[in-house]
Amino acid sequence: MTAKLKRGITKVKDPGSALTHFIAMILAIIAAIPLLSKAGHDSGHMHISALAIFILSMIGLYAASTIYHTLDISPKINKLLRKIDHMMIFILIAGTYTPVCMIVLGDKTGWTMLTLVWGIAIVGILINALWITCPKWFSSLIYIAMGWVCILAITKILSSMPRAGFMWLLAGGIIYTAGGIIYAMKLPFFNSRHRYFGSHEIFHLFVRGESLCHYVMMYRFVA
């Protein structure tokens, strides 16, 4: 093991962000237990699988972010980890849609929307993988558009879910959209003076807020 590689593994690149993402990952793992236990009492395999996809997408995002903010091996590896971090956002959005489409809707509308959302996620991942200089605003535009695909089935969702559940779904979407706009516009303007707390970190704070809202929705109204 070279000295540079050893230093990159043993020295944390961004301690603050690495710690907060690690805590979020642990909380997501813990949160999986009551969610899946509740679903397991009265639900079938498809019901449990849909919720498992949601919780695994959340854990995967925070795990990828933890690794990205922890390791500092080389510019090439850092770029790869950053891309994976960004790709996992597509997985999280699609993973959040999965229980809504499979359980709340559960009909042709739900399966059509599920196919559309995962299709967009795959396209977004390929764009991030192949377009080396993909600008933040473009990725953010896809994130936000993907997050609001549910508008296409808004009437069906409202009729299939209690109003309180829909409000949690809506709150998560609004919080996520606000974070996406901040990320796309590279806000706040003090980025250059705050090395470890810029638009990327603020975006992830909003993502955690979105995760919390949607977890509450899943636990109370879907599981």
Stretches with model-predicted labels:
Residues 1-223:
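Multi-pass alpha-helical transmembrane bundles in non-GPCR membrane proteins
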